[in-house]
A protein has these predicted regions:
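Gly/Pro/Ser/Thr-rich low-complexity, intrinsically disordered segments predominantly at protein N-termini
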Residues: 1-160
C-alpha cells in the first residue's frame, strides 16, 4: 500500500492514531492524547504569530528513507509551498519540523526522526516535551533559540 492509498482507505480514516510507515512500507500507529493535541495546536498558533513569512500546519507527511513520517507541526516558507503545494507526502522536508513527545515515544525514535528530516532538507528540528519545554536543533547542534524564529518561546504553556 502506498501513502496515497493509505490516506484514501476508508477503514483508516478517523482513527485516534497518527499513521506513519516504516522503511518496509508497513503502517505504524501512534496513539494521540488530548495533551499532545493541545501542545501541537499551541505550537502551530505560536509559529503563525512569530513566523509570518510562511505557513504553519499540523500533520505534515514527509517521504524519508525509513518510510513516510508525519511531523506533528511543520512550518514551510512560501518558496517551499510554491515548489511542492499540497504534495502528499512531501518529497523534501519543510524548513521547520516539530515533534511533540508523548508517552509512547522514545528519545531514540525522536533522534532517528530528526536525522531523517535533516536528510530531507529540514533547516531546524524542534522537540516539545510532555510539559511544553522546547528544544531547538539544527543539523549540527542543539540551539539556545531557533535561528529561523528567534522570538519563539522556550516553553509552550497550555491555558489551564
Amino acid at each position: 500500500m502506498n501513502w496515497q492509498e493509505i490516506c484514501a482507505h476508508p477503514a483508516l480514516k478517523d482513527l485516534p492514531f497518527k499513521l506513519e510507515t516504516n522503511r518496509w512500507g508497513h503502517i505504524v500507529m501512534s496513539p494521540a492524547s488530548n495533551r499532545h493535541s493541545l501542545l501541537q495546536g499551541e505550537i502551530q498558533t505560536l509559529l503563525r504569530r512569530h513566523a509570518p513569512g510562511g505557513t504553519a500546519f499540523p500533520e505534515c507527511s514527509i517521504e524519508t528513507t525509513a518510510g513516510v513520517k508525519v511531523a506533528d507541526v511543520a512550518w514551510a516558507s512560501r518558496e517551499f509551498l510554491a515548489r511542492h503545494g499540497a504534495a502528499n507526502p512531501y518529497p523534501e522536508s519543510p524548513e521547520i519540523v516539530v515533534e511533540v513527545l508523548s508517552e509512547s515515544n522514545s528519545r531514540a525514535e525522536m533522534d532517528e526522526k530528526k536525522e531523517l528530516y535533516f536528510a530531507r532538507g529540514a533547516k531546524e528540528f524542534w522537540l516539545c516535551d510532555t510539559e511544553g519545554a522546547m528544544t531547538f536543533h539544527n543539523n549540527h547542534a542543539v540551539l539556545a533559540r531557533s535561528a529561523l524564529v528567534p522570538d519563539f518561546p522556550d516553553r509552550v504553556t497550555l491555558p489551564f
